[in-house]
């Protein structure tokens, strides 16, 4: 199994350093690693500042990240609880992402997302969701699902869930 195991990691995901484009591949598969090295030497050249920032991130103690992790866990739990309380909505609890995929009681989430932006508002507010079909490689998957990021403050997430609940009660497929 060792020759078939590949670990891929990046500082952009691990340390929320979007755009840094620095990562690693670890495997005992020598052929894979040789091919990866050829590709890396021919095509990749991360900016110097990203390299310096990445090295600093690797040396940062875990305690620095604990507060942020706690905040995102709280946001996640708030969003999931709110979505689970909406009739017809199904959602799995993410374990490491800053977003969730929610199945909605709609036929086409793309149409619903567009309707939210063009035709729905409560007190001049609406909510924006990303149709999930674009995140699947299999055509037809995720048609009634949306991706919702929990990068907002907890209070804003609560309001967004209430808006989504109201929108679903008004929406006609």
Enumerate the predicted regions with their spans.
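PLP-dependent class I/II
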Residues: 1-173
